[in-house]
Amino acid sequence: MRRIAEKIEYSPTTIYLHFKDKADLLFHLCEETFAKLATNAEELLKDQSDPIQTLRMIGLAYVDFGLKHPNHYRVTFINRPLEHFDPAHHEKSMGRQAFNLLKRSVEQCVNQKKIREIDVDVASQALWAAVHGITSLLITHPNYPWVDADQTINLLVDSMCSGLKA
């Protein structure tokens, strides 16, 4: 907490007025990140015209968010200590809410027969794993000679959506 206080030019005492400890600070930072991801997905879900395109856009928005906010992404998805994960609070968390929006998008695709009958939970986790994987790789390996990040991202998301089609 002292290093954080130094970095933001506050006293450690000031930080403790808002957060009980480092785990609490990290939890709130992660919740804020999940809230932003959820807001992005909610906006995209408003367009009901093409559920596959909406699903695709949610995947692209996820990657875009991570690349534009790599430090938040690292703390939330890469460096976050697992011992702070509390299953009792998971169902109410912003992370669960953000994931449920992805699930809702997959359900819309299934219900409108845009993708084959599939376990929505499995498909949603597979889609999340794919976009998380490419986001994490691009953030943690910036010096790797990526051919063209945008083309790679689009190919991944398009492949995932095409692979689910009926």
Show where each model-derived region lies.
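An amphipathic alpha-helix adjacent to DNA-recognition modules
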Residues: 18-42, 56, 60, 99
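Hydrophobic alpha-helical connector segments
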Residues: 42-71, 124-127
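Helix-turn-helix
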Residues: 1-24, 28
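Short secondary-structure transition hinges
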Residues: 68-104, 143
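Short helix-capping/turn signature of helix-turn-helix
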Residues: 19, 78-82, 129
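Hydrophobic/aromatic-rich alpha-helical bundle segments in the mid-to-C-terminal region
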Residues: 74, 85-89, 110-157
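C-terminal alpha-helix
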Residues: 105, 159-163
